[in-house]
Amino acid sequence: MEAIAKHRFARISPQKARLVADQLRGKPVAQALEILNFSNKKAAELIKKVLESAIANAEHNEGADIDDLNVAKIFVDEGPTMKRIMPRAKGRADRILKRSSHITVVVADR
C-alpha cells in the first residue's frame, strides 16, 4: 500500500530541498517528522507539509496505520525557472534565476 503527496512549483531551489529530502529517505514517518521539526531550513517546513499530506492520504484513502508507515520514496525535481534582471553599474545587467521545485513524497507500510 502506497500513498503519494506532491507539492509542485515550490519556490525553493531543488539543490537546497534535496539536502533535507536525503535525510528522510527510508525512515519511519515518526522519525522523519521529528527530523523536520528540529531542522531550521526553509525546505524542512515545505517537505513537512507534503509528508503530513501523504500520511493523511494513507490514513484516509488506504486505511493505513500511521505507526507502520515509512518514507518509501522522496524526491525533488526541478520546476520552471523564473528569469529576472538585476541592474548593475554602467548600464549592465545580471540575470537572476529564481528556481522552483516539485517535491514528491511516497509513504508505504513496512
Curated annotation (Swiss-Prot):
Question: Record's InterPro entries?
Answer: Ribosomal_uL22, Ribosomal_uL22_bac/chlpt-type, Ribosomal_uL22_bac/org-type, Ribosomal_uL22_CS, Ribosomal_uL22_sf
Entry's Gene Ontology BP terms: translation
A Gene Ontology molecular function term of the record: structural constituent of ribosome
An annotated GO cellular component of this protein is:
cytosolic large ribosomal subunit
Name the Pfam families on file: Ribosomal_L22 (PF00237)
Query: Domain of life here?
Result: Bacteria
Keywords on this record?
Ribonucleoprotein, Ribosomal protein, RNA-binding, rRNA-binding
Function, as annotated, reads: This protein binds specifically to 23S rRNA; its binding is stimulated by other ribosomal proteins, e.g. L4, L17, and L20. It is important during the early stages of 50S assembly. It makes multiple contacts with different domains of the 23S rRNA in the assembled 50S subunit and ribosome. The globular domain of the protein is located near the polypeptide exit tunnel on the outside of the subunit, while an extended beta-hairpin is found that lines the wall of the exit tunnel in the center of the 70S ribosome.
The UniProt entry, under PANTHER family, shows: CHLOROPLAST 50S RIBOSOMAL PROTEIN L22-RELATED, LARGE RIBOSOMAL SUBUNIT PROTEIN UL22M
Q: How does it assemble?
A: Part of the 50S ribosomal subunit.
Family named by the database record: Belongs to the universal ribosomal protein uL22 family.
In its UniProt entry, what is this protein called? Answer: Large ribosomal subunit protein uL22
Q: What species is given as this protein's source?
A: Photobacterium profundum (strain SS9)
